[in-house]
Amino acid sequence: MSSISLSVLDDSVLIKPINEEKQGGIVLPSSAEKKPTKGEVIAIGEGSRNSSGERIALTVKAGDKVFYRQWAGTEIEHGSEKLIVMKESDILAIIK
């Protein structure tokens, strides 16, 4: 797991995409490549608030490997790392 010095808010999740290795030696331009849909959770927010003001804990935790929607979230760069900030609801599954 990475040691990133970022905090995300509410029900947001910070993901480091995992790029799958390409087989066969075919090089595609970046515009033709499929966006990754698998990543590692780096950080999570404290959760959104319910109508009583209490925090609703997130299901995922830092270190989880997950599948997420292909066009989910906002891509950011922090140092040399490309990361994605998304809502927990954009995560489809936790890989066990």
UniProtKB/Swiss-Prot annotation:
GO molecular function terms noted in the UniProt entry: ATP binding; metal ion binding; protein folding chaperone; protein-folding chaperone binding; unfolded protein binding
InterPro entries: Chaperonin_GroES (IPR020818), Chaperonin_GroES_sf (IPR037124), GroES-like_sf (IPR011032)
Top-level taxon: Bacteria
Keywords, in A-Z order: Chaperone, Cytoplasm
SMART domains linked: Cpn10
Compartment annotation: Cytoplasm
Keyword Chaperone found: yes
Record-level GO BP terms: chaperone cofactor-dependent protein refolding
Cited Gene3D superfamilies: GroES chaperonin (2.30.33.40)
Keyword Iron carried by entry: no
GO cellular component entries: cytoplasm
One family name in Pfam for this protein: Cpn10
CDD domains assigned: cpn10 (cd00320)
Assembly: Heptamer of 7 subunits arranged in a ring. Interacts with the chaperonin GroEL.
Family per similarity comment: Belongs to the GroES chaperonin family.
Biological role stated in the UniProt entry: Together with the chaperonin GroEL, plays an essential role in assisting protein folding. The GroEL-GroES system forms a nano-cage that allows encapsulation of the non-native substrate proteins and provides a physical environment optimized to promote and accelerate protein folding. GroES binds to the apical surface of the GroEL ring, thereby capping the opening of the GroEL channel.
PANTHER family named in the record: 10 KDA HEAT SHOCK PROTEIN, CO-CHAPERONIN GROES
Protein name in the entry: Co-chaperonin GroES
Organism: Wolbachia sp. subsp. Brugia malayi (strain TRS)
